[in-house]
Amino acid sequence: MAGGGGELTAALLKKTAENGGEEKDELGLKQKVWIESKKLWIVAAPAIFTRFSTFGVSIISQSFIGHLGPIELAAYSITFTVLLRFSNGILLGMASALETLCGQAYGAKQNHMLGIYLQRSWIVLTGCTICLTPVYIFSGPILLALGQEERIVRVARIIALWVIGINFSFVPSFTCQMFLQAQSKNKIIAYVAAVSLGVHVFLSWLLMVHFNFGITGAMTSTLVAFWLPNIAQLLFVTCGGCKDTWRGFSMMAFKDLWPVFKLSMSSGGMLCLELWYNSILVLLTGNLKNAEVALDALAICLNINGLEMMIALGFLAAASVRVSNELGSGNPKGAKFATLTAVFTSLSLGIVLFFVFLFLRGRVSYIFTTSEAVAAEVADLSPLLAFSILMNSVQPVLSGVAVGAGWQGYVTYVNLACYYLVGIPIGIILGYVVGLQVKGVWIGMLFGIFVQTCVLTVMTLRTDWDQQVSTSLRRLNRWVVPESRDVNQVSSEE
C-alpha cells in the first residue's frame, strides 16, 4: 500500500478513536461496564456454548466407550488427550493468527480483507494438517516409545486412524470460527453445534447400544459430529451470510502466504505449548504405578477441567475479538477496558466453580465410570481440580488479549519457560522422586500455570496501548489489498 494511503488510514482511525474516546469519557463507570459487557457476551456466549457442544462430543463418546471397559476408556483417553491434542494445539494455535488479522481488519473497516485472510489460512492449515497425518498412521510405535502399555496401545492405534478425519475437520472449523467471531456473527456456530451434539447422542446410542458396534460405532458418530457443523459454517460464509466480508474466492489468497505462515507458526507455538501441557501430564501419569486407574481418574478430572475451560476459552475468544477490534479502530483506552472487563468476568465465574467442585468431589465421576477405584481416585484429586479451575479462569483470557494484540511470539517464550522449564521438572520431582504419584505431577504443573499467569499479568499491566495501536496499524497497512486491486476472483457475489 502506498505511503499516502497508510497515512490517510491512520488519520481516519485517529479521528474515529478521538470521537469514540470523547463519547466514552462522558459515560459513567457503570454504563461503560454495561456496554462493554454486552459487547463481550455477544461473542463470549455463543463461543462458550459452541465449545461446550464440541467438548461435549468428546465427553459423550468417552462416556459410551467407558462402559465398554477400562482398556477402551484408557485407549480413547490417551488418543484424544495426547495425539489429537498434539495436532489440535498446532492447528488451533495457527488459526489464532486469523483471529488477530480478522479482528484488527474488521475494526479498521477493511471488510474485504477478512475473506482473503480466511482463504490464506485455509491454504496454510491444510498443508499443516497433511504433514501431521503420519502421527496417526504410526501412532502405535509412537505411544509404545512414550512408555504406554501395549494392551492400551493396541486399541489406541485403531482409534487413531479414525481421528485422521477429525483432524482434517479442524481446518474449516477453527478458521470459520475465527472469521465469524471477528464480526460478532458466531451465533450460527452455536446453533449448528447444538444440532450436532443432539445428532451425536442419538447416533452413539443407535450404533453402540442398539447395534452394539463398539469402538467403530463410537468413532463413526464422533466423526459425523465433528464434520456436520463445518458444512453448515462453510455454507453460511460462502452463500450470503457474510456479504460484506466474503467477496468470493480470490487469487489474492495466494499472495503474502509467507508472512501469514510466520504469524501462524508463532501463534501455533503459543497455544500448542499450552495444550500439550496437559498431554504431558497424562503421559507422565501413564508411567506411574497402577497406571490404568490413574489414567482413567486423571482423564475424568481433565475432562471436568476441560468443561470449565470452555467458559474461559469463550472469554479468550471474546477478549481477543474485543481487543483486536479496538486496536484496529485506533482506540487504546477501549482495548484496555475490554481486557479488564473480560478478566474480571471470567475470574468471577471461576471463583463460583471453584467452590462448586470442592463440594462435589468424586460424585461427578460416576457419569464417566462405574469403577469404585477410579471414583475414589477422582475424589482424592478434586482439590487440585478445583484449584486448576480457578487458575484457568484467568490465564486463557490473558492469552486472548495476547492474540488480539498480536503478541503470540512473546507468549510462546513465556509458555516454554513456565511450563516446560518450571512446571514439568517440579512435577516429575514431586511425582517420581518424592513419591506423590499423580498428585505430585499435577501440583508441579499447576505451579507452572501459576507462574505463567503471573508473567502474563505483569505483561498486560505494563502494556503501552497507544504503541499497540501503532503496531496494529502498521501490520494492517503492510498487508492490505485495496478493493480495486482484488479483481482476480474465481467467483463473486453481487
Swiss-Prot record:
Record field: transmembrane: 40-60, 73-95, 123-143, 158-178, 188-208, 217-237, 268-288, 297-317, 340-360, 384-404, 416-436, 441-461
Recorded topology in the membrane: Multi-pass membrane protein
Predominant location: membrane
Compartment(s) where it occurs, according to its Swiss-Prot or TrEMBL record: Membrane
Matching Pfam families: MatE
Record's GO cellular component terms: membrane; nucleus
InterPro entries named among the record's database cross-references: MATE_euk, MATE_fam
Annotated protein name in UniProt: Protein DETOXIFICATION 21
Taxonomic lineage of the native organism: Eukaryota, Viridiplantae, Streptophyta, Embryophyta, Tracheophyta
